[in-house]
């Protein structure tokens, strides 16, 4: 038993597994080819011609905001990586997925010792429970939106989690400024991820204020405001208003919310039941 525990906490095994996760995702990305919207995003939304340089992306995104939607950060990455050799995206996307696994591990175990079994378990759970794994984790357009949006959200919330735990965070001025700027990008990234990040950030700040009896940090309040600015920019873009609000109205958002809850029940009910059991056990024991 001691040998197994020692092996489970071995840092070299842990890092080897991290490298293995990266390798698996790199191979899967390498053999995932362009599909569907990838081909339309190869062309500029402004000129309808093939994008040749990075500078072509900026007028394309301006036209995208007017005609499609205001989700510009995610689609900037889509057009950027469609412009670059495909191998670059294979590496970057594998890195982002590995970062997702690591931040989930960090949230669950915080500052505890390395746990190789837990790392593999998190990878397996994400693999099994992520809806449409290929579309959200491998496909270029889909992963730039959903995988990256989820990963960026968890990393952006990390300082708020540290704050709630009374740990030191955001001590440098440059760090705070960059965090505020990143807040606008986070708010403009993906409707669901952006809104969820804003709500969770507010809840963590409220917990810090009323449960820990501490003042609201300036960087925390400022980042919520920049996220809100980015979110409003995305939701009020002419393309968003024309294609989403105008066609479906408020009831469309209500229907989407109901459908999303149905999907959560369908795919994540088992995880929810496990969570309830663990919470009950932690209270009783």
Provide a role label for each language-model segment:
Residues 6-7, 105-116, 164-172, 208-219, ...:
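Membrane-interface helix-boundary motifs at transmembrane edges
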Residues 94-117, 155:
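Transmembrane-helix motifs of polytopic, lipid-linked glycan transferases
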